[in-house]
Every structure is written in structure tokens, then in C-alpha cells.
Curated annotation (Swiss-Prot):
Its EC number is 6.1.1.20. Mg(2+) binds at D459, D465, E468, E469. Its cofactor is Mg(2+). Keywords: Aminoacyl-tRNA synthetase, ATP-binding, Cytoplasm, Ligase, Magnesium, Metal-binding, Nucleotide-binding, Protein biosynthesis, RNA-binding, tRNA-binding. InterPro entries: aa-tRNA-synth_II/BPL/LPL, B3/B4_tRNA-bd, DNA-bd_dom_put_sf, Fdx_antiC-bd, Fdx_antiC-bd_sf, NA-bd_OB-fold, Phe-tRNA-ligase_IIc_bsu, Phe-tRNA-ligase_IIc_bsu_bact. It comes from Streptococcus pneumoniae serotype 4 (strain ATCC BAA-334 / TIGR4). This is Phenylalanine--tRNA ligase beta subunit. SMART domains: B3_4 (SM00873), B5 (SM00874), FDX-ACB (SM00896). The lineage of its organism: Bacteria, Bacillati, Bacillota, Bacilli, Lactobacillales. It catalyses: tRNA(Phe) + L-phenylalanine + ATP = L-phenylalanyl-tRNA(Phe) + AMP + diphosphate + H(+). Residues 708-801 form the FDX-ACB domain. Tetramer of two alpha and two beta subunits. Gene3D superfamilies: 3.30.56.10, Bira Bifunctional Protein, Domain 2, Ferrodoxin-fold anticodon-binding domain, Nucleic acid-binding proteins, Phenylalanyl-trna Synthetase, Chain B, domain 3.
Length: 801
């Protein structure tokens, strides 16, 4: 919200520096982004009168003689198409500073001396988006009463100061000058001075020519007025200046008035050309599938059943609360105008504007809420201004449908509760003073009082809101401070917090870098890297489809980061994230999803780069597995890895499911080449673990066990196996022998070739045995090996070589 300080001072009698006001507003609840003046950095720009203007042959240039209030005229060469004799213009004299700190100097153009520059608004730093279209390609023409030689700033209100407010959703009342004026008046204990709009009506009743009806509960109220004999023309300079300072482009005297009322009351309005209507009945209803509407921006919009539309003769003429239709817009030929003021459902407006990516000042205000008590007042004010500025006559009465509750909202409290919550010792007189300054009604006494809250402050509905208002206006800086009471208890980390720290320690120790990715993603990426996707949890009104669904995995987000870095030649990456994924087993519209703590990482590129001593070491499956092994060793968990091809986003031959007993903890594998190509990344290995499941499996601290004094014994065994037998199957067969003294199994060699026969391979293992209470004998170890050999022959048909 941009606030003109000049305009604000017309509404509230204050005389403090704008920066001081900004600081005061920030400390009382409305954040101020900054204060700027359009004239900042500009100098030596004066009013000039064009005395003569001659064309330069074979060019678009003009030689102008300009009166700038000096004894002698100045010759200035100008290329603007709208320069002509007899107009007042903005002249930057030699030495002047214009936008971007550009300094104007004397010069020659096509051999013609130019002693300055005739300026456009853009050359003074005014955004092209707010410059009136009639001056968009040329210079700004000043009012006829502008005095040559005087600075131009006051004529265009460039000497104003613009306060930019950052309005939070709960203070949408400050999206209007009236709302800001009430706030400033309360801060400085001043009265508001709102303009009185005088409206004169004709004897001809508007209801005789127009009817209004509402066919949906999404539009509580709709009102319209009819104006005749309208003369469309540019708005007066003061109104154009005000709108440009507020960031709005002036259009014409009718449209500019609706924008003025929007800023003044916070009430969105729209003007229709009555002569373009095909009927006399305005209906507010929900759109039908298949209906279309060309909006004011020239775009044809496909309407949905959730959209609110204004119709005439059952044809949409406007998207309610968002944008009008092109067919009924105000043009230079318009002479009969219908003014609209209404209240629309904010959620419906937000859904429509979000779906169409069509946001406007009006839709923003409907989404956040408007003052329902001033709808008719704003409509009357707009009619009054158009009658004054466009010579219009206003038909008698407002044509409306629906009802509005404009009565004050009553909220009760006690002085004891106020002081208890705020930690103060306020008197009832202090509370009375606060609500008097706010313009609220108050009845009762210290034991029990009731505050009557005007509809302009629709954010105040409960007792806690009263406490906040008292604290704001009384002054946060005046509230007493105290040290925390010494009655707390020492806290400790939860199990999941400890687990997250352990995981982070292992990941950082392995050289991984932590990142944080979005929990919202696309519907397609949400279910990637999941064997059994759950129901999608979708946002009702996403800002973009890229952030519309809660993720069910973290890998896709990490791969987006990998792709971003790879595209920028950062190819050796080891990234991890600890966060939450969301599993929805019920109806997303009725139930919240389960939040699952997870850990995921992605590795790509080289583990170690090539140097003069060693070859480059690329990332592979086993390097990724080693990180997980280190983690599980730290946690004291014995997990198993089982090959799988059920996760379609992963390589079917290089993927394993990680299990603890019968419970699946996660997966490890290479990103499927097709998926990697879609992300535009090289060979990448990923893993994801369910930390919530691991948390439930963690055991209490293992008691100290004395290191045995007795030596371990190792035996090597080479096995001839069929090629399809896996390492895990061999390990399972060895463990199935039930040898209690077996403490370690290591695979140290794998060989296949013609000598072994077709479809055969050799795998060599080192087996370690140890008795913590005694030395093992050769006979005992031999018996263990016999049991293991028998199990291998039975389970995997192994032949000991």
C-alpha cells in the first residue's frame, strides 16, 4: 500500500516528519517498508513555455524557443511528437539532474545548439506503467497556469512523500486512506477530517431502468447507480498526480474516480457503459462450464463453475471482483454509466484470480476483506465525483440486492484480564483513552466492559484482539519488563532431535552438504521415488502448479538442486536433507496427512578427482551404501538390503530396499537413466530413510562390554556358485549355520571366466571367529567350518573350492 503523505495530512491534522511517522507506525503494528519522494535526486527542472516550434527538415526533431522565466529565451532541440507552440512543459536546464543521476549539459544536435532538455515523465524516473497513455510516447504537458521558471515538482506533486506500507492479512483495513487515517489519528490522538461528498440526484429513478438480483451466496450484496450525460475526458491534474503517486495509471475521469474511491475507502468499484448492455437486469451468479469472457486486458478467459460473474441478458460482462469485460468498458463515446459497488466472497475471488493468474487491486482487497459499512457511501461518493468532473447527472436511488450487517461488533473483557495479560497496572481511564483514540465505543466499568468495534476493523472479534489494541496504542515500549521466573525445569532433547543430530554428524563427516528444499512440489514429482504412493495432499489455492502438492519424497527436490548446480558446471555433488514427507492415507479434504521425519541424500560426480598419484574415483552404489552403513553402525542397528525393481524412478538392477526385521526403513539406488535424463543430470545415486521408523527401533544405550583378551581366528573359503546367486544369499546361508562364535563375514574376491564354466562364478570370503571367554582351538573352528559348508551346500548349492 502506497500512502501519499500530502493526502494523509488532508485527512489527519499532523505535522511530523514522514520518517518519524513511519517509525511510529512500525512500532504500533503496521510495518513501513520505506519512505520515498518522487523528486529525490532531481534538480534544476523548471516550467517552460514553448513560444515557437519549428520542424528540422528530414528529421523527427523540432527546434523550440522556450521561456523558462529568464531574460532570454532558450533554444532546445526536442524529438517528442507532441511538442508544439503554446504549451507548458518540463525543462531540465544545463547542470540539472534527472533520473539515474544523469546530468544535463549544453550540446548540439544536428548542428543545432540545445540549451537544455524538454522532459517526459519517464526521464524524471516515473514508471512507464503509470504514465498516462496520451503522454506515453512524448513529453508531459503541464497545466496552463504553470508559471515559467518555477520548479515543476509542485505542479505534478513530485514533491510529495510516498510511504510504503507492508500490510499483513489481519490489517487489511489499512488498504485504504480512511483506514490509514484512523490508524494515524489513534497514534497521535488526533481527529480524522474526511471529505464530505455532496450528491444531487434527478427525479428519474434508477430502479425504473435497472434491476439487480443475486443467485449465489458468494455475493452477499450488490449495488449500482446510473449516471447520465457523462462526458469522458482526462481527469484534472490533481487526480492524475495522486493516482500516479499511488502507482496507478490515469485513464479518464470515470475510471480514475473508481480508482480514487478504491484508494480512499478501500472499496473496489467498476464502471460499465450502459449503452453496451443488451438488457436491463444485472444478475450475479456462478459461471457455467464453457462460458467465456474477454476481459479488459484483451484476453479471452475460459470460465469455471467456481467463478463469480456479473451478467446482463444471461451473458457474462465482468469477472466479479477481479476484472471487467472488454465489451462493456468505458470508452470516449460513453455517455451513460453504471457504477457498481459490491461485497464478494474473498475465498471465491482468490480462487478465481489464482486460477487465471489475474490479480488486481480489487481482487486483493476482496480477498483480505473490505469495510461493509461504507459500500453505499463509497458508491455515492463516486457518483458525486463523476457528476463534478464529468458533468454527469445522477438518477435517484441505489439499485441493490442482498443485505449487509453493518452493526458494530461487541467484545467484552475486564480490566483485571487486561493487566494480567499485558503485565501492566493500567487504570480504567487508560483503557477508556485507548478506545476513544481508536474511535471505538465503550460501556461498562473496570469489573466488566464492552467495546463496540466499528465494521471498519473487522479483524477485532475476540477478547485477545482488545488486549492487542490496548498494547499497541498505549505503547509497546511502555509495557513493563521482567526477568523470567526461576521456576522452570531443565529440558533435554527429544529422541528424534538426538537422532537428527546423529544423522547430521554422520552426513557432514562423510562430506555431504545440507540443503533445504521446498515441501511443496508438482503432482508428478510428489510421487516419484515411492513404491506405493499415497493420496495427494493438494493446496486449495496454490500460487503456482510447481508448488501445489505436499511432497511424498525428498529425492525429487534434491535432484532439482543437483540439476541447478550441474547446469552451472558444479558437477561433483554430495547433498543431503533432513525434513518431512507427507503421507495421506485418508481423504485429503477431511484429514491431515501423516508427517514423517526423513533423511535423504544424493551423490553424483567424483568422490576424489584425479591427481598425479591416483586415478579419479567416481561415486558408485557401494560408496553411497557405505554412508548408510556408517550411520547404522552409529545407531547400533543391523539392517538388510534387498534388491528391488518396484521403484520405477530408480535403476532396476542397482536399487535396494533397506529393512530392519520386517519393517522397511527406506531405499538406496541409482536414479533411473530415463529419470536422470528428465532432470538433465548425470549418473546419480540416492537414498532416503524413514527417521520416524528408525526412532521407534532405537534401543536404549548398550551397556559397556569388556574387550576380550582372547584372539580371533580367521578362515578363508572360496565358493563355486551359479552366477545368479547374490552376495546377500551367501551371507544368509552362512548365518543360517547358527555358529555363535562367528563375528564377521567379508567378501574379498569375485571371479568369473571360461575356466569356471558357463554361468558360474567364484566368491571368496574371510570368516572371523572369536570366543570372548577362551581361546578357540583348531578343532572348534573346524567344526564351525563344517557346519557353514553344509549350510552353503544346502542353501545356495555352493561347492567349496
Amino acid at each position: 500500500m502506497l500512502v501519499s503523505y500530502k493526502w494523509l495530512k488532508e485527512l489527519v491534522d499532523i505535522d511530523v516528519p514522514s520518517q518519524e511517522l513511519a517509525e511510529k507506525m512500525s512500532t504500533t503494528g503496521i510495518e513501513v517498508e520505506g519512505v520515498e519522494s518522487p523528486a529525490a535526486g532531481l534538480s534544476k527542472i523548471v516550467v517552460g513555455e514553448v513560444l515557437s516550434c519549428e520542424d528540422v527538415p528530414e528529421t523527427h526533431l523540432h527546434v523550440c524557443q522556450i521561456n523558462v522565466g529568464e531574460e532570454e529565451e532558450r533554444q532546445i532541440v526536442c524529438g517528442a511528437p507532441n511538442v508544439r507552440a503554446g504549451i507548458k512543459v518540463m525543462v531540465a536546464l544545463p547542470g540539472a539532474r534527472i533520473a539515474d543521476n544523469y546530468k544535463i549539459k549544453k550540446g548540439k544536435i544536428r548542428g543545432l545548439e540545445s540549451l537544455g532538455m524538454i522532459c517526459s515523465l519517464g526521464e524524471l524516473g516515473i514508471s512507464d506503467s503509470v504514465v498516462p497513455k496520451e503522454f506515453a510516447d512524448g513529453i508531459q504537458i503541464l497545466p496552463e497556469d504553470a508559471v515559467p521558471g518555477e520548479e515543476v515538482f509542485s505542479y505534478l506533486d513530485l514533491d510529495d512523500e510516498i510511504i510504503e506500507l507492508s500490510i499483513t492479512p489481519n490489517r487489511a483495513d489499512a488498504l485504504s486512506m480512511c483506514g490509514v487515517a484512523h490508524e494515524v489519528a489513534a497514534i497521535y490522538d488526533k481527529a480524522v477530517n474526511f471529505k464530505k461528498f455532496t450528491l444531487t440526484e434527478t427525479n428519474e429513478a434508477a430502479a425504473d431502468a435497472l434491476s439487480v438480483s443475486i443467485e449465489t451466496d458468494k455475493a452477499p450484496y450488490y449495488a449500482a447507480r446510473i449516471l447520465d450525460n457523462v462526458t469522458i475526458a482526462p481527469s484534472p491534474q490533481w487526480l492524475q498526480n495522486l493516482l500516479m503517486n499511488e502507482g496507478i495509471r490515469p485513464i479518464n475521469n470515470v475510471v480514475d474516480v473508481t480508482n480514487y474511491i478504491l484508494l480512499y475507502f478501500g472499496q473496489p468499484m467498476h464502471a460499465f457503459d450502459l449503452d453496451t448492455f443488451e438488457g436491463t437486469d444485472i444478475r450475479v451468479r456462478e459461471a457455467r462450464d464453457g462460458e467465456k469472457l474477454v476481459t479488459l486486458d484483451g484476453e479471452e478467459r475460459d470460465l469455471a463453475e467456481t467463478d463469480l460473474v456479473i451478467t446482463v441478458a444471461d451473458k457474462p460482462v465482468a469477472l466479479a471482483g477481479v476484472m471487467g469485460g472488454q465489451a462493456t468498458e468505458i470508452s470516449e463515446k460513453s455517455s451513460r454509466v453504471i457504477l457498481e459497488a459490491a461485497v464478494f466472497n474473498g475465498k471465491s475471488i482468490r480462487k478465481t484470480s489464482g486460477r487465471l493468474n489475474l490479480r488486481s487491486e480489487s481482487s486483493s482487497r476482496f480477498e483480505k476483506g473490505i469495510n461493509v459499512a461504507t459500500v453505499n457511501e463509497a458508491l455515492d461518493a463516486a457518483a458525486s465525483m463523476i457528476a463534478e468532473l464529468a458533468g454527469a447527472t445522477v438518477r435517484k436511488g441505489i439499485v441493490s440486492a442482498g443485505e449487509l450487517d453493518t452493526s458494530d461488533v461487541e467484545v467484552s473483557s475486564t480490566l483485571a484480564d487486561v493487566n494480567r495479560v499485558l503485565g501492566t497496572e493500567l487504570s480504567y481511564a487508560d483503557v477508556e483513552d485507548v478506545f476513544r483514540r481508536l474511535g471505538f465505543g465503550l460501556s461498562g466499568n473496570a469489573d466488566s466492559f464492552t467495546v463496540s468495534v466499528p465494521r471498519r476493523r473487522w479483524d477485532i472479534t475476540i477478547e485477545a484482539d482488545l488486549f492487542e489494541e490496548i498494547a499497541r496504542i498505549y505503547g509497546y515500549d511502555r509495557l513493563p519488563t521482567s526477568l523470567p521466573k526461576d521456576d522452570g525445569t531443565a529440558g533435554e532433547l527429544t529422541v528424534i532431535q538426538k537422532l537428527r543430530r546423529q544423522v547430521r554428524t554422520i552426513a557432514e563427516g562423510a562430506g555431504l552438504t545440507e540443503i533445504i528444499t521446498y515441501a511443496l512440489t508438482t503432482p508428478e514429482k510428489a510421487v516419484e521415488f515411492t513404491a506405493q504412493p499415497s493420496n495427494l495432499t493438494e493446496l486449495m489455492w496454490p500460487m503456482t502448479v510447481d508448488r501445489s502438492v505436499l511432497r511424498q519424497n525428498m529425492i525429487s527436490g534434491i535432484l532439482d538442486t543437483v540439476a541447478y548446480n550441474v547446469a552451472r558446471k558444479n558437477k561433483n555433488l554430495a547433498l543431503y536433507e533432513i525434513g518431512k514427507v507427507f503421507e495421506q492415507t485418508g481423504n485429503p479434504k477431511e484429514e491431515l496427512p501423516n508427517e514423517i521425519n526423513s533423511f535423504a541424500f544424493a551423490l553424483t560426480g567424483l568422490v576424489a578427482e584425479k591427481d598425479f598419484q591416483t586415478a579419479a574415483v567416481p561415486v558408485d552404489f557401494f560408496y553411497a551404501k557405505g554412508i548408510l552403513e556408517a550411520l547404522f553402525t552409529r545407531l547400533g542397528l543391523q539392517v538388510t538390503y534387498t534388491a528391488t525393481s518396484e521403484i520405477v524412478s530408480l535403476h532396476p538392477g542397482r536399487t535396494a530396499v533397506i529393512s530392519l526385521g520386517d519393517q522397511v526403513l527406506g531405499f538406496l539406488g541409482q536414479v533411473h537413466p530415463v529419470t536422470a535424463k528428465a532432470y538433465d543430470i548425470p549418473e546419480t545415486y540416492v537414498a532416503e530413510l524413514n527417521l520416524s521408523a528408525i526412532e521407534g527401533a532405537l534401543q536404549p544405550a548398550v551397556p559397556f562390554v569388556e574387550i576380550t583378551k582372547f584372539p580371533a581366528v580367521s578362515r578363508d573359503v572360496a565358493l563355486l556358485l551359479k552366477a545368479e546367486v547374490t552376495h546377500q544369499e551367501v551371507v544368509d546361508a552362512i548365518q543360517a549355520a547358527g555358529v555363535k562364535r562367528l563375528t564377521d563375514i567379508k567378501l574379498f574376491d569375485v571371479f568369473s571366466g571360461e575356466k569356471l564354466g558357463l554361468g558360474m562364478k567364484s566368491m571368496a570370503y574371510s570368516l572371523t571367529f572369536q570366543n570372548p571367554e577362551d581361546s578357540l582351538t583348531d578343532e572348534e573352528v573346524a567344526r564351525y567350518m563344517e557346519k557353514i559348508q553344509a549350510s552353503l551346500e544346502e542353501k545356495v548349492n555352493a561347492e567349496v573350492r
